[in-house]
UniProtKB/Swiss-Prot annotation:
Localization of this protein: Nucleus, Nucleolus; Cytoplasm
Summary of the function given for this chain in its UniProt record: Inactive serine/threonine-protein kinase that plays a role in cell cycle progression and neuronal differentiation.
Protein name: Inactive serine/threonine-protein kinase PLK5
Region (Disordered): 109-135, 224-245
Induction of its expression: Down-regulated in primary brain tumors.
Organismal lineage: Eukaryota, Metazoa, Chordata, Craniata, Vertebrata
Free-text note regarding domains: The truncated protein kinase domain is predicted to be catalytically inactive; has lost the main activatory autophosphorylation site and the conserved key residues involved in phospho-substrate. The C-terminal region (containing the POLO box domain) is sufficient for inducing cell cycle arrest.
Superkingdom field: Eukaryota
Gene Ontology cellular component terms for the protein in this record: centrosome; cytoplasm; kinetochore; nucleolus; nucleus; spindle pole
Predominant subcellular localization, coarse grouping: nucleus
Domain POLO box: 255-336
Family, similarity comment: Belongs to the protein kinase superfamily. Ser/Thr protein kinase family. CDC5/Polo subfamily.
Length: 336
């Protein structure tokens, strides 16, 4: 509740010992900008003594839930995407910032670097360091060249994905290659990408790659998360030492393959969605849908995600940087 209302967890401190002490003693920043009802509810929920915390029945009767305006219904995508208001700026921008504050997972894409492919004890970073980092950037002269040979520094598949005719690609890989090629078969290069729309999509904004030892884990935008062990899909531990993965919102949506090159991380999902995150200049693209419904969504540093159908780049072309990113993703899949 604290995180939803403020946009940050209540207990954040370094080192960890200080954070654990704050949890035990119930010390956290007081959100003075919230309403009095919201602050009282947070105080009750985060009481140091568990016996003083409200039960579910008492919680539902709290003034925070019983007073004020409550909409009759909400669209399904409101669970994983900030609202898009049809209001002219600057008021529209203010409302959108409020929505992004409530949905903290909807942030600019996180650059992937080869260091993140290392496991613990091998120079790899702490998993917490792989969260969104809107401050990371490189100048134009530091943009890495994506046209060199593809060298995969890490890759993995589901165990069931290993079966198939010798020397042949899996159908989902072939489909992803066709979709990427369709995006590249567009009109002449443009000076900038065409104007698109902001549409909610389900993708994986967070991941951690310890595949050398423990596996690859990711979290979807709706909060669903799971992982892949080095020798197959993740399964719940009976001893209770690991929590059961939260099922994603998409029906049967799971990660089939992940590929990491020196400049990008590619994720291929069971619904055919291709997600590519680039290092250097933070950029992210998601290719989803099938056939004429194919949709390309792009994120660049400091700008919200923009989506457009395949017909738009066919008629208006796309920026050279976008074409370079699509071509790099195509070559990554061709290298397996």
């Amino acid at each position: 509740m604290y995180t939803v209302l403020t946009g940050t967890p209540p207990f954040m401190a370094s080192p960890l010992s200080e954070m654990y002490q704050n949890i035990r003693e119930g010390h956290y920043p007081e959100p003075a900008h919230l309403s009095a009802n919201a602050r009282r509810l947070i105080v009750h929920l985060l009481a140091p003594n568990p016996a003083e915390r409200p039960s579910l029945d008492h919680l539902l009767q709290d003034d925070f839930f019983t007073q004020g305006f409550t909409p009759d219904r909400l669209p399904a995508h409101s669970c994983h995407s900030p609202p898009i208001f049809a209001i002219p700026p600057p008021l529209g921008r203010i409302f959108r910032k409020v929505g992004q504050r409530l949905l903290t997972q909807c942030r600019p894409p996180c650059p992937f670097t080869p260091k993140e492919a290392s496991g613990p004890g091998e120079g790899g970073p702490d998993p917490d360091s792989m969260e969104w980092d809107g401050e990371s950037s490189l100048s134009a002269k530091e943009v890495p060249c994506l046209e060199g040979p593809i060298h995969l520094v890490a890759q993995g598949t589901l165990q069931s994905d290993l079966a198939g005719p010798e020397g042949s690609r899996r159908p989902e890989v072939e489909a992803a290659l066709r979709h990427l090629q369709l995006c590249l078969d567009v009109g002449p290069p443009a000076t900038q990408d065409p104007l698109g729309e902001q549409q909610p999509i389900l993708w994986a904004p967070k991941w951690v790659d310890y595949s050398s030892k423990y596996g690859f884990g990711y979290q979807l935008l709706d909060g669903g998360r799971t992982g892949r062990h080095p020798h197959g899909p993740a399964t719940p531990r009976r001893e209770g030492t690991l929590p059961t993965p939260v099922p994603p919102a998409g029906p049967g949506l799971c990660l089939l393959r992940f590929l990491a090159s020196e400049h990008a991380l590619l994720l291929l999902f069971s619904n055919g969605m291709v997600q590519v995150s680039f290092s250097g200049v933070p950029a992210q693209l998601v290719l989803s849908g099938e056939g004429e419904g194919l949709q390309l969504t792009l994120w660049e540093q400091g700008s919200p995600g923009t989506s457009y159908s395949l017909d738009v780049p066919r008629s208006h072309g796309c920026a050279p940087t976008t074409g370079q990113h699509l071509h790099h993703a195509l070559r990554m899949l061709q290298s397996i």
